[in-house]
A protein has these predicted regions:
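OB-fold and OB-like single-stranded nucleic-acid-recognition modules
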Residues: 1-290
Length: 290
């Protein structure tokens, strides 16, 4: 989540949104960059939470939340009139974000616009053990999650896919994408990654501006995959994106039917393999019996 000053946009194009869902086991909580606090260039507080989710024994998806102190937060109220639903919002000073709706002088039908989290268990009125559900500003979610997350927790996560680019020291433009969670919840049952009957949930959905499709090749030999090229339109940037497909029939349909610069929605599975390397260590004799 980039620091957003909501300055006037340089172009008037609708943003293309992307979302994802994961179920798996938390990992990387012991890494140095798991949770960090700092300051922005303008002196505002910032927090970062970085962790992984193992969705298969050899597949890990990285997640990252970047959040900043803001002047205010917003509360939302839904009003239903017949089949029509309307929404009202009210801005609340940042320092008052933890106050109850009663303390803020709002009714019970108002709620904070924020991220959902359920990383603790509690017993409800029916005697059932359920997740303790909270709604927090992303800034507060990072700290709370860092205190309640642990490796190998079974979780369900959903959120937004963020894109951006930067220019490296060599002048080369580099693209990046980030899975930014808006919900982190414990699952009702423990997840066994080795269960062959388990249905893997590691999915994304992305609206994009289609530009081209081509067959992927290595050393001029087709790999069996096709690369879909497109543009992701953000609030203040337009970034390149690539998606891969293996369905040859669908690839032909894209090539013949989808015109360049059409707005399309793509979806599929997130596959990020865990890189491993076997290293041979020369035996120095330590620990061996005489």
């Amino acid at each position: 989540m980039a620091e957003n000053t909501k300055s006037k946009r340089l172009f008037n194009l609708p943003e293309t949104k992307g979302t994802f869902q994961l179920e798996g086991l938390i990992t990387d909580c012991a890494k140095d960059d798991f949770y960090k606090e700092g300051k922005t260039q303008k002196g505002k507080d910032k927090r970062t939470l970085s962790f992984g989710v193992k969705v298969e024994p050899d597949v890990k998806v990285g997640c990252k939340i970047k959040a900043f102190e803001k002047p205010k937060v917003y509360f939302l109220k839904r009003e239903k009139n017949g089949e029509k639903t309307t929404y009202k919002t009210k801005d609340i000073p940042w320092a008052d974000r933890f106050k109850s709706v009663k303390e803020l002088g709002l009714g019970d039908d108002w709620s904070l616009i924020g991220s959902r989290v359920g990383l603790e268990k509690e017993t409800n009125g029916k005697g059932q053990v359920v997740n303790k559900k909270l709604v927090l500003d992303p800034f507060d979610l990072t700290k709370y999650a860092s205190e309640h997350m642990a490796d190998n927790q079974s979780v369900f996560i959903k959120g937004d896919i963020e894109y951006g680019s930067f220019t490296g020291g060599d002048g080369t433009k580099r693209q990046w994408s980030r899975m930014s969670p808006t919900q982190i919840s414990l699952t009702s049952k423990e997840i066994d990654l080795d269960d062959e009957e388990r249905k893997v949930r590691s999915d994304f959905k992305q609206t994009m501006v289609f530009t081209n499709i081509e067959q992927e090749k290595e050393n001029d030999v087709p790999t069996g995959r096709f690369i879909v090229y497109g543009k992701i339109i953000g609030y203040s940037s337009v970034d390149d994106a690539e998606f891969y497909m293996t369905n040859k029939k669908l690839a032909k349909t894209f090539d013949k039917k989808v015109k360049p610069y059409s707005s399309i929605e793509v979806w599929g599975h997130i596959k990020t393999e865990i890189q491993t390397e076997e290293v041979e260590v020369e035996d120095d004799g330590w620990g061996e019996a005489d």
